[in-house]
Design a protein with these regions (language model features):
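Short acidic-glycine loop/turn motifs at beta-strand connectors
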Residues: 8-10, 52, 64-65, 113-116, ...
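Fe-S ferredoxin-like electron-transfer domains
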Residues: 53-100, 107
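Phosphate-binding loop and its immediate beta->loop->alpha context
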Residues: 72-89, 124-159
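Phosphate/pyrophosphate-binding loops at sites that engage ATP/ADP/AMP, CoA/4′-phosphopantetheine
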Residues: 161-180
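Helical "lid/coupling" subdomains associated with nucleotide-phosphate turnover
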Residues: 139-148, 152-156, 160-166, 191-195, ...
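Gly/Thr-rich phosphate-binding beta-strand-loop-beta motif of the actin/hexokinase/Hsp70
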Residues: 91-130, 255-273
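Short glycine-rich phosphate-binding loop at a beta-alpha junction
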Residues: 176-187, 333
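Local cysteine-cluster metal-coordination motifs and their immediate loop/turn environment
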Residues: 33-65
Length: 386
């Protein structure tokens, strides 16, 4: 067993690492959260840290005794918490209820008064499971490949949501004894993991979950019962059911399309006579996995790019650019096509093949492929484009 010093935000922490254990695993075990969209397989490049002042991928490093690890200070994303007003049907019920939106990437908790339905507090955060993979497939793989992995992921998310509800209660001057119910919605995999139910069946044909949560699971959080939103199928979860209910689309004649655009993308097409549903594993596309300088749409992300005698760009938060979010990536690719830096086959040209005015932005990588430099820190590679 070795000892490693971790530096974060001006503070230092000493953690222990097992023999042969990766730095990412040791950091997870010690309560530190690093983005690892690929689940620690060395593919996404998002778990980069400083090890003795050298930039390394935490999932590829087995630390030595005495190593000093510097973690990046990542800002949180802008998580939507505004929703349409919902008319209360609470009647004469008393006490409080918590509504939980358990997303693959983000978690939101909202506290209500049952009598009258008044909203008291909303808290949102990144899903702490993100360190174990950016999408539901990565999380399923973790539960299948890691001894006790399912219980570990369940414990992590239950502790996070319990803490978020507790903070909401404290902020409102309320006690835990006033909490009467918690209602939780999420995709089928997230609801299974929260309930510590096996998810292997969802990963293989015929993609059959353990339950669709049609009946209560006798689950409890903070001494209050947990009610799960019924799911539709293995990859169409309780979040779709709740969305169709709250939007009222199930009552409307004709055809409406309900979209849940997230890490696990789902859609439902239909109306008062029923819905057809489907899903797609969007994966961590919105978080920039697989793109060398990709990142989520948080402070420091280049969100828009255009060419007007030079490359101009907008940065979320107004600070120095750190990477490209999805909209910035699409803008940049379009601008490079217009400027002749990307050919009709999708190839990013090396400098000698590009228009003369573009050559100062281009270099070659170690394999001879073109690399475009928007700034010193932000680039786009040929592999990113293809």
């Amino acid at each position: 067993m070795s000892s490693v010093r971790v530096l974060l935000g001006g503070k230092s922490f000493d953690i222990k690492t097992e023999d042969g254990e990766t730095l990412l695993s040791a950091l997870r075990r010690s309560g530190f959260t690093l983005p690892a969209a690929c689940g620690g397989r060395g593919k996404c490049g998002k778990c980069r840290v400083g090890v003795n002042s050298v930039s390394r991928l935490a999932c590829r490093v087995v630390p030595n005794d005495g190593d000093v690890v510097t973690l990046p200070e990542k800002s949180g994303g802008r998580i939507l918490t505004q929703t349409p007003e919902i008319v209360s049907c609470a009647g004469k019920m008393s006490g409080l209820a918590a509504a939980v939106d358990l997303g693959t990437t983000t978690v939101a908790v909202r506290l209500y008064e049952l009598a009258g339905g008044r909203e008291l507090k909303t808290i949102s955060a990144w899903n702490a499971q993100a360190a174990y993979g950016g999408d539901v497939i990565s999380r399923i793989q973790y539960t299948m490949e890691t001894p006790n992995g399912l219980n570990e992921l369940s414990r992590i998310i239950r502790a996070q949501i319990e803490d978020m509800i507790s903070r909401a209660l404290e902020d409102c001057g309320k006690s835990k004894s006033e909490l009467r119910h918690t209602v939780l919605v999420g995709n089928t995999v997230m609801q299974h993991i929260f309930a510590s139910l096996p998810v292997e069946g969802i990963a293989r044909a015929p993609f059959k979950p353990e339950t669709l949560f049609e009946i209560d699971c006798n689950d409890v959080l903070l001494d209050a019962p947990v009610h799960y939103s019924p799911c539709v199928a293995g990859y169409v979860g309780g979040d779709i059911t709740a969305g169709l209910l709250s939007s009222g689309l199930y009552k409307k004649p004709g055809r409406s399309l309900f979209l849940d655009i997230g890490t696990n993308g789902e859609m439902a097409l239909g109306g008062s006579d029923g819905f057809a549903c489907c899903a797609v594993a969007s994966g961590p596309a919105f978080e920039g996995a697989g793109i060398s300088c990709g990142m989520a749409a948080v402070d420091g992300a280049v969100s828009h790019v255009r060419y007007d005698g030079g490359f101009l760009y907008d940065v979320i938060g107004g600070d120095a650019p750190c990477g490209l979010c999805g909209s910035g990536l699409i803008d940049l690719a379009a601008a490079l096509i217009d400027c002749g830096c990307i050919d009709e086959g999708g190839r990013l040209l090396p400098p000698e093949e590009a228009p003369e005015k573009m050559r100062r932005y281009l270099t070659r990588d170690e394999n001879g492929n073109g690399v475009f430099h928007l700034t010193r820190e932000v680039c786009l590679t040929a592999q990113d484009v293809r």
